């Protein structure tokens, strides 16, 4: 008997289409897996068994009538930063502990239209601020490969549930690496689309000029199938780009002969572990063997400034976006009967966690009179320089190849009291958000039993190219097929 929880989207779809399994069977298998593993992994904020089984039943009826799409009947999970009508959406914050949205995020509606089955909402760093999922106001998600390690963040629950085979796929959000870094730590495929490719409507905002929604899957083909479902223009999101959505799965034939790939030197900095560099070199050898040309002498000299730029711009946007949480309109309220200003002050003091408060303070400082030009405006100028450097590089190369992270999954609590060390986890991913580029992290091996991720960065809206390279690499390797022993 096929182990149903190990199936990819493509494999599940074929079995459903051939009537060899039902969505109800597939969904029950994943719910049983969740029940078994959640006490240890803690990937889910909310599990929705009744909703899932009802949606699975509807999917089975549609399949019997011959109405089946690539995601019909496929069990999935959503990061708890995406609004779900009638289902609690907390952002893993006390501030939204009991918030139930009256509407769905655009991507949630699109997945429902495709017939996907919602298993539940996943844990995350509070308001998507963090790199380990330790900043959740409720509990810390654990890495399925080693439960003493973090799964990455901020979308740690979404990465962990796919790695642990608790869901066939999941959605996360990526502001500075929050899909790709946990994908690397959990050895799954994690994709950040081009900025504007996927509607952010119904995504609780962290930094609006950087946020983007994307999938976690078991391989690049599955990633393409999910992107086919969620990409596209939405007039409710002013940053959504009105263009024809490509078929992300077309051209995934394993052939990248003649592709020109660049390797930026700045991504192999002093804080990069040598054993990770070794794994990336092995991966470059695979890509070269597939017929791609590799140039290891690419330079993007403004890369070292990206971290500083990010930690001025992202907190600045966050301080504005989070000003709406005042204890009056919705969400947590400390004591609405007190003086309004005092109640608002105490609501924010007790409703937000320490990392969120830290970033609000940084952002408020950067936007304040006397510092706006010195910090915020200057950061925007450097952002432009970083984007221009990428554009110049893409005049010569089809894609850029880097490590996803400079470090391996670290122990729970190891970096929690050192914000700078935590921020350094995203040095390889942040520049891509600053430039609005597409990028994917795929499994590239293991060091000491812990996963290493390879990052493939594409030109703006050349999302298909990144997918083609990722798929070709996975056709030639088997790292993505490895699963943790649980």
Swiss-Prot record:
GO terms for molecular function: ATP binding; glutaminyl-tRNA synthase (glutamine-hydrolyzing) activity. GO terms for cellular component: glutamyl-tRNA(Gln) amidotransferase complex. PROSITE patterns: AMIDASES. Its EC number is 6.3.5.7. It catalyses: L-glutamyl-tRNA(Gln) + L-glutamine + ATP + H2O = L-glutaminyl-tRNA(Gln) + L-glutamate + ADP + phosphate + H(+). The active site is at 79 (charge relay system), 154 (charge relay system), 178 (acyl-ester intermediate). Keywords: ATP-binding, Ligase, Nucleotide-binding, Protein biosynthesis. GO terms for biological process: translation. Belongs to the amidase family. GatA subfamily. Heterotrimer of A, B and C subunits. HAMAP family: GatA. Allows the formation of correctly charged Gln-tRNA(Gln) through the transamidation of misacylated Glu-tRNA(Gln) in organisms which lack glutaminyl-tRNA synthetase. The reaction takes place in the presence of glutamine and ATP through an activated gamma-phospho-Glu-tRNA(Gln). This is Glutamyl-tRNA(Gln) amidotransferase subunit A. It comes from Dehalococcoides mccartyi (strain ATCC BAA-2100 / JCM 16839 / KCTC 5957 / BAV1).
């Amino acid at each position: 008997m096929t182990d149903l929880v190990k199936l990819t989207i493509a494999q599940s779809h074929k079995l459903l289409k051939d009537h060899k399994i039902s969505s109800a069977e597939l969904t029950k298998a994943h719910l049983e897996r969740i029940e078994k593993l959640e006490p240890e992994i803690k990937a889910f904020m909310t599990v929705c068994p009744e909703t899932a089984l009802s949606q699975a039943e509807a999917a089975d009826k549609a399949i019997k009538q011959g109405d089946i799409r690539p995601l019909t009947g496929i069990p999935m999970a959503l990061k708890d930063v995406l609004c779900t009508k009638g289902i609690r959406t907390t952002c893993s914050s006390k501030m939204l502990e009991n918030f139930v949205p009256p509407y769905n995020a655009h991507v949630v509606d699109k997945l429902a239209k495709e017939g996907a089955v919602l298993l539940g909402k996943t844990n995350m760093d509070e308001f998507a601020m963090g790199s380990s999922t330790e900043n959740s106001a409720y509990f810390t998600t654990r890495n399925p490969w080693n439960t003493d390690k973090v799964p990455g963040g901020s979308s740690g629950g979404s990465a962990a549930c796919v790695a642990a085979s608790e869901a066939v796929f999941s959605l996360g959000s990526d502001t500075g690496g929050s899909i790709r870094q946990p994908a690397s730590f959990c050895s799954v495929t994690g994709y950040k689309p081009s900025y504007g490719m996927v509607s952010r409507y119904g995504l609780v905002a962290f930094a609006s000029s950087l946020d983007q929604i994307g999938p976690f899957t078991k391989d690049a083909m599955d990633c393409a199938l999910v992107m086919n479902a969620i990409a596209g223009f939405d007039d409710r999101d002013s940053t959504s780009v009105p263009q024809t959505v490509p078929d992300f799965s077309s051209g995934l034939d394993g052939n990248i002969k003649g592709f020109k790939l660049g390797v930026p030197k700045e991504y192999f900095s002093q804080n990069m572990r040598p054993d990770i560099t070794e794994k990336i070199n092995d991966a470059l050898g695979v890509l070269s063997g597939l017929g791609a040309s590799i140039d290891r002498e690419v330079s993007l000299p403004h890369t070292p400034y990206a971290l500083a730029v990010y930690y001025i711009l992202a907190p600045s946007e966050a301080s504005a976006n989070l000003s709406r949480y005042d204890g009056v309109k919705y969400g947590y309220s400390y004591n609405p009967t007190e003086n309004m200003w005092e109640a608002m002050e105490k609501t924010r003091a007790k409703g937000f966690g320490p990392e969120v408060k830290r970033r609000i303070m940084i952002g408020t400082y950067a936007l304040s009179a006397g510092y706006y030009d010195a910090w915020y405006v200057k950061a925007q100028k450097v952002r432009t320089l970083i984007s221009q450097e990428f554009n110049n590089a893409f005049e010569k190369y089809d894609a850029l190849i880097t490590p996803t992270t400079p470090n391996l999954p670290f122990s729970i609590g190891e970096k929690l009291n050192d914000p700078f060390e935590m921020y350094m986890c995203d040095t390889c991913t942040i520049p891509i958000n600053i430039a609005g580029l597409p990028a994917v992290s795929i499994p590239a091996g293991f060091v000491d039993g812990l996963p290493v991720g390879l990052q493939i960065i594409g030109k703006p809206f050349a999302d298909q190219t990144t997918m083609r390279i990722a798929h070709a690499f996975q056709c030639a390797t088997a790292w993505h097929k490895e699963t943790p022993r649980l």
